Amino acid sequence: MDYRQPDLSVITVNYNGFHDTCEFIDSWAATVFSVSYEMIVIDNGSTANEAALLQKTYPFIQAVRSERNLGFAGGNNLGINLAKGKYLFLLNNDVCMVKDAIPLLIKRLLSSDKIAGVSPLIRDYAEPHAIQFAGYTQLSPITLRNRAIGKGKINKDHYPAQKTPYLHGAAMF
């Protein structure tokens, strides 16, 4: 058994989403090769014991069942308490990874001591060329609102890494 600390702890919360979670794990396994990681899947009170099914299907993950739904934050906190990685990556179970995303996120995170966390550009699942998230604007002091940068626009690789006051809950590194 390997007792070295993994570079990355990947944490996702599942609630009655076995097929989405399988698609997420498959996309991760097919695209992430350059970092050591542990994957922690929290089954957050699903009707069926999906943790057992996930553990059987993917023996390389750590599937943990919570008998009751702890909510999004509670499920992630359960995973964080189990994590051993140098970095944490909280991901929704309905995301799909793209090749080389992880090394770029780590590089960006380490590029400045002023960076506390990073979120990747997120594309819409149903329309993969449309952007769901490329950052957020600052809160307006007048309206106390902000907006998502690039939301609904076509991704033409014109959204470079930029400072954003908020990370997207679907993918927080």
Model regions: which residues?
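A recurrent flexible, glycine/aromatic-enriched loop bordering the glycosyltransferase active site
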Residues: 153-173
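Short, acidic, metal-binding catalytic loop of nucleotide-sugar glycosyltransferases
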Residues: 26-36
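Cell-envelope/extracellular polymer assembly enzymes that use nucleotide-activated donors
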Residues: 7-9, 38
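Conserved donor NDP-sugar-binding/catalytic core segment of glycosyltransferases
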Residues: 96-133, 139-141
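Glycine-rich, basic loop-to-helix element that forms the pyrophosphate-binding segment
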Residues: 65-83, 93
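Short aromatic/hydrophobic "clamp" motif used to bind/position activated sugar donors
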Residues: 88
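Short beta-strand/loop segment that forms part of the nucleotide-sugar
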Residues: 36-45, 64-66
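A conserved acidic beta->alpha catalytic loop
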Residues: 18, 27, 43-52, 68
